[in-house]
């Protein structure tokens, strides 16, 4: 029995096909300014803001920027459009460097523009699906859809209940409206320095690819986002303070293998950044799928696909041209539910690097646009069955990761899954809750290539928005329920994202300023040392009075009139030169013949090698003794001269007593040196005593040796 329609479920008015003509025809940088003009000039017709019915959709404005559910939004001021972002973004907009919130989840019913194969057609209304034959009366009757939308945040099932999300679009909304709610705020965050991730999730044939890429009549989120990105780049580059680099990569995950969609693209000079590394690639498959790429951990990006082609783009047209090249290589096939079904997960990676021209610092952030393949039932075709199994496996792994990530928050706040009103659906809803609150702390990111690539985004390195596409028809109720369960869990995943760090390029004005400051500090330190040197009248170790006086004269002569650094270097060189001369005198071994006749006789008695070695050793010792004696005599003469002169007290006072102390230390070292040499001589005599006794003995051994 068909229930009586509520006011919110009345048949919507048909929409004019000419409404899509207002959509901008080109996503280039030159034409994207029309988007902001449309936003400023679009004025919706006023209506009663307290009305709870959406039957007024027949009087909606034809502006492509008008939100479908704007009339039911009590926060909108009448007379002008106000694009309201998700609550999680608005609540945390005060924090410029960090973002704290959750994954933004939006629901989009299957668009009417999406065609299907065989007898499946697009959704004709938000409440009714295709007509079916009535056997009793022989006429066609509409089968009512079990899902309907009450406002811009709620989607309701007749038996299960209602689901609330950040935003629920009407079935007749345009891609431009979806872009205004989802993608545009993410581009703003990208320009601020945050990583941003947008992915479409849903069953096959529900409109994911149409939402992300669009068609010839209606642009999708990817071209609209690219246009808005380059428009902001042009505006921020006009003052000359910043410059931007945009690099694109495009990959797909087909049967749990990663392939580069830009590798076989047309070569353009200077556009290719990196050549795929064969070290981390598998060999090309025999079926022409290209070279499989591998995922590796990366300190900067979390994970990185090794060998993925990167193309530098100067305009939105160039970037969209590369995306079109990748789309031609993407795996697409016909299924029971869709004439052109995506058989792989496709991810567009747009890396934006902004450089501050003044200080040379740069910041890189990445926009990830993911068009996931849809879950589907088993089919009779062997190839499609194999593809579907890999797709379902990766989506199951993604659901498991989302479930475990949302477990903590679901325990404290409660699941977003509504309580069923029928006993038949109680077990399914309860199982969903139990899966989301699994006590395990392990997050199985490595169960699939998809979750491995999304690991940095889901673990807090990116702001995430998901667009869950659903089919509200009765025969797709099970798949729609699974999608909404996934969306409910995703809404509970907490995010705490920080801006990407600023990187210094090394040869910028900031480093120059730091170098200048370092040199300035060194100069101040040298000036301070010179000032202390003038006050103390010495530098370093005062070896002699003449050296101190000459050093002071050099500094005095050049300290005021010349460069103070030059005076300091001259003084240091003089001290070092004096030290070097003394060391050379002490270490040089002269070749003066030995004067001790007894030692000479002993040396001649020994074998040639031993005698030569002993003679050389004695020569060195005698040379050192002579040098020490000369040095000691010089110091003694210096002391005697100071004592005899009448300026001894004045000299000592001028040197602050330091020279006397140093001279006394030198005398002590001299005494120790003499004592050490005497000790060495005693050891030598003790060592030579057996040889002398042997020489004086009448034993015939000595005569035989000779």
Swiss-Prot record:
Might be dimeric. Residues 1-139, 413-445 are annotated as: Disordered. Required for assembly of the mitotic spindle. Residues 1-28, 36-63, 414-441 have a biased composition (Low complexity). Present with 656 molecules/cell in log phase SD medium. This is Kinesin-like protein KIP2. Residues 127-139 have a biased composition (Polar residues). Pfam families: Kinesin. The keyword Cell membrane does not apply. One of its GO terms (biological process) is microtubule-based movement. GO terms for cellular component: cortical microtubule plus-end; cytoplasm; cytoplasmic microtubule; kinesin complex; microtubule; mitochondrion; spindle pole body. Belongs to the TRAFAC class myosin-kinesin ATPase superfamily. Kinesin family.
């Amino acid at each position: 029995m068909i229930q009586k329609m509520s006011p919110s479920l009345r048949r919507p008015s048909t929409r004019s096909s000419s409404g899509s003509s207002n959509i901008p025809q080109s996503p280039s940088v030159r034409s994207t300014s029309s988007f902001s003009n449309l936003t400023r000039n679009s004025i919706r017709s006023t209506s009663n803001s307290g009305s709870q019915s959406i039957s007024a959709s027949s009087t909606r404005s034809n502006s492509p920027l008008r939100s479908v559910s704007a009339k039911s939004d009590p926060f909108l001021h009448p007379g002008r459009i106000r694009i309201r972002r998700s609550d999680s973004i608005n609540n945390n907009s005060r924090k410029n460097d960090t973002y704290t919130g959750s994954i933004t989840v939006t629901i989009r019913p299957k668009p009417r523009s999406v065609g299907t194969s065989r007898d499946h057609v697009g959704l004709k209304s938000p409440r009714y699906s295709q007509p079916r034959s009535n056997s009793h009366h022989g006429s066609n009757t509409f089968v009512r859809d079990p899902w309907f939308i009450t406002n811009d945040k709620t989607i309701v099932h007749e038996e299960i209940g209602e689901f609330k999300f950040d935003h629920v679009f009407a079935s007749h909304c345009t891609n431009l409206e979806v872009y205004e709610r989802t993608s545009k705020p993410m581009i703003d965050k990208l320009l601020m320095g945050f990583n941003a991730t947008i992915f479409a999730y849903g069953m096959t044939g529900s409109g994911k690819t149409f939402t992300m890429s669009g068609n010839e009549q209606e642009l999708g989120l990817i071209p609209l986002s690219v246009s808005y990105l380059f428009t902001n780049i042009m505006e921020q580059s006009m003052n000359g303070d910043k410059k931007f680099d945009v690099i694109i990569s495009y990959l797909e995950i087909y049967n749990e293998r990663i392939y580069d969609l830009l590798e076989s693209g047309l070569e353009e000079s200077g556009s290719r950044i990196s050549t795929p590394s064969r070290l981390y690639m598998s060999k090309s498959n025999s079926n022409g799928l290209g070279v499989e790429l591998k995922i590796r951990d990366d300190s900067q990006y979390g994970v990185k696909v090794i060998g993925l082609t990167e193309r530098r783009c100067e305009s939105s047209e160039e970037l969209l041209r590369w995306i079109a090249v990748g789309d031609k290589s993407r795996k697409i096939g016909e299924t029971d539910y869709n004439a052109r079904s995506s058989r792989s997960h496709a991810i567009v990676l747009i890396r934006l690097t902004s450089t501050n021209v003044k200080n040379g610092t740069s910041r890189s952030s990445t926009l990830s646009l993911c068009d996931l393949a849809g879950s589907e039932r088993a089919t009779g075709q062997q190839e499609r069955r194999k593809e579907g199994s890999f797709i379902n496996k990766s989506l199951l792994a993604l659901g498991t990761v989302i479930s475990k990530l949302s477990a903590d928050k679901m325990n404290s706040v409660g699941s977003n899954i509504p309580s069923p009103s029928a006993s038949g659906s109680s077990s399914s809803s309860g199982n969903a809750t139990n899966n989301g609150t699994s006590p395990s702390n392990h997050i199985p990111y490595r169960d699939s290539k998809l979750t491995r690539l999304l690991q940095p985004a889901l673990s807090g390195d990116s702001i995430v928005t998901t667009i869950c596409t659903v089919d509200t028809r009765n025969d797709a109720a099970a798949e729609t329920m699974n999608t909404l369960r996934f969306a409910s869990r995703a809404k509970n995943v907490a995010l705490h994202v920080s801006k990407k760090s600023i990187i210094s390029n090394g040869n910028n004005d900031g480093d120059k300023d730091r170098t200048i400051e370092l040199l300035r500090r060194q100069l101040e330190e040298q000036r301070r040392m010179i000032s202390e040197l003038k006050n103390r009248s010495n530098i370093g170790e005062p070896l002699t009075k003449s050296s101190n006086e000459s050093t002071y004269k050099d500094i005095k002569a050049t300290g005021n009139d010349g460069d103070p650094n030059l005076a300091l270097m001259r003084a240091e060189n003089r001290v070092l030169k004096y030290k070097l001369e003394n060391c050379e005198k002490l270490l040089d071994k002269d070749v003066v013949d030995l004067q001790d006749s007894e030692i000479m006789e002993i040396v001649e008695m020994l074998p040639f090698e031993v005698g030569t070695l002993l003679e050389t050793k004695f020569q060195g010792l005698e040379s050192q003794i002579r040098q020490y004696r000369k040095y000691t005599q010089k110091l003694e003469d210096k002391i005697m001269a100071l004592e005899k002169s009448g300026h001894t007290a004045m000299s000592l006072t001028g040197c602050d007593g330091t020279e006397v102390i140093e001279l006394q230390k030198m005398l002590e070292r001299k005494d120790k040196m003499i004592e050490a040499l005497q000790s060495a001589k005693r050891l030598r005599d003790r060592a030579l005593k057996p040889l002398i006794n042997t020489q004086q003995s009448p034993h015939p051994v000595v005569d035989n040796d000779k």
